Regions:
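Amphipathic alpha-helical polymerization modules
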Residues: 1-146, 262, 266-369
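Polar, low-complexity export/assembly segments characteristic of proteins
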Residues: 17, 28-31, 35, 127, ...
Length: 369
């Protein structure tokens, strides 16, 4: 016959009471925190998986934010080009082609000066539009989005980051930065203004939008794993001069047309700056430049559509990850309440058992304390 001593009964009771207390505390904590576990030790496997999911959620959220920012930037760029190029309502048509065609009409030669002023104002409006911003960043400034990219200097030339983009007399000059220092190329040679413009036109601003962002052995971004968010204004509008020495930039062509028109002397019927044939040729080049910009406009639209679809994919990925996280971490309120009720019942039962296990003298002592 096994004899159960009072001390043995007390030890068993204390152990069971502690288990009931812990179960009650655990059930109460679950209901208050709405979480399945509050520490790694509670459920190591689930906690490890949850940590990985949280990491993926944070990365996906950052990628979605990057994608959304770039998308709005591209939408702003698209809208800007629409105001410049769009059909019969764009700045090029209203303030470029129409006044140019009107001025070159023999019956309107007397209005050439006025038409020239309209064209000049149109070119200035285009430059202002191309200095548009999204948030605090200039849209068409390439990788240097904190400074306005375009201007028209005192000599009447369009500049990009301070460099005249189509002045034949300065394109081959050595470029000097704000401190008067040249920039060296890969071979240690001083770069010319044209070479610097080429460099700016090719610069990149890579952003992680969930394409598998990765660096190569030299710490450079692998292009296929990121999105290049840099939009070069000169890449869109053109820069440099053609074989005839005429500007390729759309606004510069308009400024040159304005110079020719404003230089016409109606009284003597002479072209003091350029000639009629030059103006007619520039008008053709204006159309060609607008067509080239239209192709870049289409490219922007294609890239904006890609960003829009990528944003939808990132959102779907985030939602799927969040569902998995919720299944691991979040409680079912009904189950949690039932668990709490059961734990409370067990705890009360354990207390009730104590009245039969603990000697009456000890119970009386505990009541008197």
């Amino acid at each position: 016959m096994i004899r159960i001593t009072t001390n043995s009964s007390l030890r068993m009771y204390r152990s069971n009471l502690m288990k009931s207390t812990n179960s009650l505390n655990s059930a109460m904590t679950k209901l208050m925190t709405q979480r399945q576990f509050s520490s790694y030790a509670s459920n190591p496997a689930a906690a490890t998986r949850a940590f990985k999911i949280h990491s993926s959620l944070n990365a996906t959220n950052a990628q979605y934010s990057n994608n959304d920012t770039v998308l709005h930037k591209y939408e702003t760029a698209w809208s800007t080009l629409a105001s410049v190029l769009d059909g019969y309502d764009g700045l090029v048509q209203d303030t470029g082609r129409v006044p140019a065609l009107s001025g070159l009409n023999d019956t309107n030669l007397s209005t050439l000066n006025t038409q020239g002023q309209i064209i000049r104002e149109g070119a200035e409006a285009i430059i202002q539009a191309m200095n548009g911003k999204y948030g605090n960043n200039f849209v068409f400034a390439g990788a240097d989005s904190l400074n306005a990219p375009f201007a028209i200097n005192d000599k009447g030339f369009v500049t990009y980051r301070g460099v005249e983009i189509d002045n034949p007399d300065t394109l081959d000059d050595i470029y000097l930065d704000d401190k008067g220092q040249p920039i060296k190329d890969a071979n240690g040679k001083d770069m010319t203004n044209k070479e610097v413009l080429d460099m700016w036109n090719e610069e990149h601003q890579y952003v992680d939008i969930g394409l598998g962002f990765k660096l190569d052995g030299n710490g450079e971004v692998i292009p296929s794993t990121a999105f290049d968010s840099a939009i070069s204004g000169i890449g869109i509008m053109g820069y440099g001069v053609d074989a005839d020495g005429d500007p390729k930039n759309l606004a510069s062509i308009m400024l040159r047309l304005a110079d020719i028109f404003e230089g016409y002397d109606h009284e003597t019927q002479t072209w003091n700056v350029g000639s009629r044939s030059e103006a007619e040729e520039l008008l053709k080049k204006l159309d060609a430049s607008r067509e080239a910009m239209g192709e870049k406009w289409t490219t922007l639209d294609t890239e904006a559509n890609f960003l829009d679809k990528n944003g939808t994919q990132l959102k779907n990925t985030y939602d799927a990850l969040n569902v998995e996280r919720s299944n691991l971490e979040d409680i079912d309120p009904a189950d949690a309440i039932l668990e709490l009720v059961w734990a409370k019942t067990c705890y009360n039962a354990a207390l009730q058992v104590g009245t039969n296990v603990i000697p009456q003298s000890l119970m009386d002592y505990m009541k008197s304390v």
